[in-house]
UniProtKB/Swiss-Prot annotation:
Cytoplasmic side: 1-52
Sequence segments annotated as region (Disordered): 1-42
Protein name from the UniProt record: C-type lectin domain family 1 member A
Matches recorded under PROSITE patterns: C_TYPE_LECTIN_2
Species lineage: Eukaryota, Metazoa, Chordata, Craniata, Vertebrata
Organism: Bos taurus (Bovine)
All copies of domain C-type lectin, residue ranges: 144-258
Amino acid sequence: MLAKYSSTRDMLDADGDTTMSLHSQASATSQRPELGHTEHQRPSSAWRPVALILLTLCLVLLIGLAALGLVFFQFYQLSNTQQDSILQKEEKLGNLSRQLQSLRTQNRKLAETLHHVAEKLCRELYNKTGEHRCSPCPEKWKWHGDKCYQFYKESKSWQGCEYFCIAENSTMLKINTQEVLEFAMPQSYSEFFYSYWTGLSRNSSGKAWLWMDGTPYSSELFDVMIDLTSLRSRDCVTILNGKAFSKDCRELRRCACEKAAAMVKVQSLHEPLSRRWR
């Protein structure tokens, strides 16, 4: 009986072991998926902080881009405003420049008109008295047209008169227009036969007559009476009693000089004569 019990216990033990072994296997089998699920969930929980950080960085980047866009927009508006302001200022400057140019033109025209009126008035006063404080010429010089003339009593050679006129800041007389001819020839009348050198000369009898500035002589204005009694290397022209004569340049004759007249100034019409020649 003991042997039967022992065999039965052994069988129970064997069955128990078998049962326990099966239970253990079942338990182990049922627990494996839980372990796998746990291992599968661990990486997800580890990426959460990283994802949060990346999301935060993205938000910061978006905010930065938005701020940068706002700054760029403000700068763009400011640039457009400044550009409009510059264009407006340039337009105003252009208008002012045109107005200034117009005023300068008007001022120049007024100055020219004033000069013509003053010159006309001064010339009328000068023609009445022969000399007036408004005259644009130096003292004792004759005003005619736009030139001042002086007929000196000193007698010199032609070259001597050239140097004399240069010393007076002038040149020798030049008769190149009918108006000057009608003015200069009456000045040459003299009861003592004093003639005046002009700036007309030529190197030899075959050469053309030239004025000192190189312009040619016009025979349509006046004729030059040639002296054929002697041969000379250089001929110079004098005027006497309304006629022109060819003479030896070394002869002594009076000097006739001319210079450009100064502009008639309005204030000179009100200055005393004695004050003008100080």
